[in-house]
Amino acid sequence: MNDAVITLNGLEKRFPGMDKPAVAPLDCTIHAGYVTGLVGPDGAGKTTLMRMLAGLLKPDSGNATVIGFDPIKNDGALHAVLGYMPQKFGLYEDLTVMENLNLYADLRSVTGEARKQTFARLLEFTSLGPFTGRLAGKLSGGMKQKLGLACTLVGEPKVLLLDEPGVGVDPISRRELWQMVHELAGEGMLILWSTSYLDEAEQCRDVLLMNEGELLYQGEPKALTQTMAGRSFLMTSPHEGNRKLLQRALKLPQVSDGMIQGKSVRLILKKEATPDDIRHAEGMPEININETTPRFEDAFIDLLGGAGTSESPLGAILHTVEGTPGETVIEAKELTKKFGDFAATDHVNFAVKRGEIFGLLGPNGAGKSTTFKMMCGLLVPTSGQALV
């Protein structure tokens, strides 16, 4: 299995009515033994490529081989050794966890003692053992992804194609999912993980960066990040707010991209630019600008040619709201909501002041949506107050 590879030779896919190919001619090789990330924004061609590798779409030109099999000509042989987990869970939500596993085992012709041993291993691997009788539709997003992965692994595939498995999954479940996938890769499985999340891309040993159907980069994320050394900066001004400061900076020819980060403005400068160019630029107020550690996101945006330096249309129509700075505008006081004996929120207290961006963080089932619904008047609190 350590020799398992995917090879693409001029692989291309076009759809009627599109000016550009969904996947431009691709040439690359993907190896087993570690997780390879297929990274790009929505519409980059990630799902189309995955479907061609799984034999679900026929390429218009070029070819692919997956561990020696042509996905179209040898589809039966390939499907026996390939696991494909699509963006949608691929689960039957009106069936229980065990019923879903049994269905996939039937489809894979896994029977008898082999089925029993496989289920025991997968239920332990995914920590779904206590939930075998629960309907799939009643599982959290993270648990659904674990069940989807378990169903995909029933046939013990040599190749695993995961199409954006981290979407809609809370950070704790996503971390557990990554641990499971890294363990599988360590056993020699070939794993291709599709994502638009750049923090996920950094967890991959190798990445394929795509945009508008084209492959822009293949290699280690760290190697690409290192190309941004000396070009990432944090900027503040004692005389101007960050939003106005960002608008000014984005109009400068020396700036490739910028965004507000906490209490600073993060800038990516073009290769030939220096911090002094920004300090002395016409129209810029007094600023403090210091180099910061580059991120993979900086390199990715720069590779795309920058995210655009024109003023945001939305930002242009937003105006400062009058009010007392520091005034509390949203408040939860002992906010509690119970559904029967279950407390979805339990005496929650917080206050949001004018001008703040307040993050309400937590895993699936933590009570975030319930809190929002009470704040919006869509749910009546069991006790406590929601003030807006």
Tell where the protein language model's regions lie, with residue ranges:
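ABC ATPase "signature
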Residues: 218-219
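Short, charged/small-residue-rich alpha-helical element at the C-terminal edge
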Residues: 229-303
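Short acidic-hydrophobic catalytic motif
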Residues: 222-227
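Non-catalytic surface loops within mature trypsin-like serine protease
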Residues: 17, 32, 130, 239, ...
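ABC transporter nucleotide-binding domains
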Residues: 3-6, 13-209, 329-330, 334-388
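ABC-family P-loop ATPase nucleotide-binding domain
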Residues: 1-14, 284, 290-337
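A generic structural signal for secondary-structure junctions
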Residues: 83, 109, 229, 304-305
